[in-house]
C-alpha cells in the first residue's frame, strides 16, 4: 500500500498526539482486542489479562512504541520493523489476521481520545498506515 505525501503528513500529525500516551493507548488497544476478539488471548497465556494489569500496560506500550517508530520512519517501515517481523513470524508465530484486528482496535482508541483530529482524511491515512505495518509484519511469513 502506497502512502501519499498527504497520508504521511496525516500519520505523523496524529502520532504527535499519541506519542505521550503509548502505555495508556496500547493497554486500551490490547484490552479492546482481547474482549472483542477472544481468540487473540491465546498468544498471551502467561499474562494477567485483567483490566489495568502491568503486563498489558507493558506490552501495550511496546506495541504503540513500535507504531510510533514506524511513523517516525514512515519511508522505511519495512526496515524499521524488520526485527519485529522476524520475531512474530518465526518465534511467536502470530496468526497474521491478528495484526488487522489490532489495527482496528487501535483506530477505535485513537477515535475515542482524539475525535476532532480523526477527520475522514486522517482516518483513511491512519488505516492505510496500519495496513502497511501489518503487511510488513506478515511479509516474513511467506
UniProtKB/Swiss-Prot annotation:
One of its GO terms (cellular component) is haptoglobin-hemoglobin complex. Keywords: Heme, Iron, Metal-binding, Oxygen transport, Transport. Pfam families: Globin. Residues 2-142 form the Globin domain. GO terms for biological process: hydrogen peroxide catabolic process. O2 binds at residue 59. One of its GO terms (molecular function) is oxygen binding. Red blood cells. InterPro entries: Globin, Globin-like_sf, Globin/Proto, Hemoglobin_a-typ, Hemoglobin_oxygen_transport, Hemoglobin_pi. The keyword Transferase does not apply. PROSITE patterns: GLOBIN. Heme b binds at residue 88. Belongs to the globin family. Heterotetramer of two alpha chains and two beta chains. Involved in oxygen transport from the lung to the various peripheral tissues. This is Hemoglobin subunit alpha-A. It comes from Meleagris gallopavo (Wild turkey). The lineage of its organism: Eukaryota, Metazoa, Chordata, Craniata, Vertebrata. The gene is HBAA.
Amino acid at each position: 500500500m502506497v502512502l501519499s505525501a498527504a497520508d504521511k503528513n496525516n500519520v505523523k500529525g496524529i502520532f504527535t498526539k499519541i506519542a505521550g500516551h503509548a502505555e495508556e493507548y496500547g493497554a486500551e488497544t490490547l484490552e479492546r482486542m482481547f474482549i472483542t476478539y477472544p481468540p487473540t488471548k491465546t498468544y498471551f497465556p502467561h499474562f494477567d489479562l485483567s483490566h489495568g494489569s502491568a503486563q498489558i500496560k507493558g506490552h501495550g506500550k511496546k506495541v504503540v512504541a513500535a507504531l510510533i517508530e514506524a511513523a517516525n520512519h514512515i519511508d522505511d517501515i519495512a526496515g524499521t520493523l524488520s526485527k519485529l517481523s522476524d520475531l512474530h513470524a518465526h518465534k511467536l508465530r502470530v496468526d497474521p489476521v491478528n495484526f488487522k484486528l489490532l489495527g482496528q482496535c487501535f483506530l477505535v482508541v485513537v477515535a475515542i481520545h482524539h475525535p476532532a483530529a480523526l477527520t475522514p482524511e486522517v482516518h483513511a491515512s491512519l488505516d492505510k498506515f496500519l495496513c502497511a505495518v501489518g503487511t510488513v509484519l506478515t511479509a516474513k511469513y511467506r
